C-alpha cells in the first residue's frame, strides 16, 4: 500500500501539492504513481516563469516503462523547478514527497484548491483502483 502523507493535497491524476505559504505550492507525483511507472530515466520540467493553467500538461516523467504527462494541479506561474532531477531522475522514485519534487508554482486562483483531494479522499481513490 502506498504512503499518502496527510499534510498534502492530491489530484486524481496522482500529483501531490504541498502548501509552502504565500500562495506558493510544491508539486510532485505520488508514491503510487512512481510505483506504477517504475524506474525514472528522464524528467522534462517546465521553465521558471511559465504561466500554466489548471489541467495543463506542463511536465513529463519518463520511466523504463512509459512517458507520462504531469498535469498542473493549480493555475499560476512556475517559480522554481527541481534541477537536481536533471542528473538524478531516480529521486522521483526514492523520495517522491521530498527530494523528488518537480516544480513550485505561485497560485493565481486560490479557489482551485477546493478541487484537490485530501489524503483520505486520495486513499479512497487508490482503494477503488486496486
Swiss-Prot record:
Keywords, A to Z, come to:
Lipoyl
Q: What SUPFAM superfamilies does the database record attribute to this sequence?
A: Single hybrid motif
For this record, the Gene Ontology CC terms, alphabetical, are: cytosol; glycine cleavage complex
Positions of post-translational N6-lipoyllysine modification: 65
Q: Which GO terms describe its biological process?
A: glycine decarboxylation via glycine cleavage system
- Lineage, top-rank taxon, reads Bacteria
**Required cofactor(s):** (R)-lipoate
Q: Which Gene3D superfamilies match?
A: 2.40.50.100
Question: How cofactor binds (record note)?
Answer: Binds 1 lipoyl cofactor covalently.
Assembly mode? The glycine cleavage system is composed of four proteins: P, T, L and H.
Its job: The glycine cleavage system catalyzes the degradation of glycine. The H protein shuttles the methylamine group of glycine from the P protein to the T protein.
Record-given protein name? Glycine cleavage system H protein
Q: What lineage is this protein's organism placed in?
A: Bacteria, Pseudomonadati, Pseudomonadota, Gammaproteobacteria, Enterobacterales
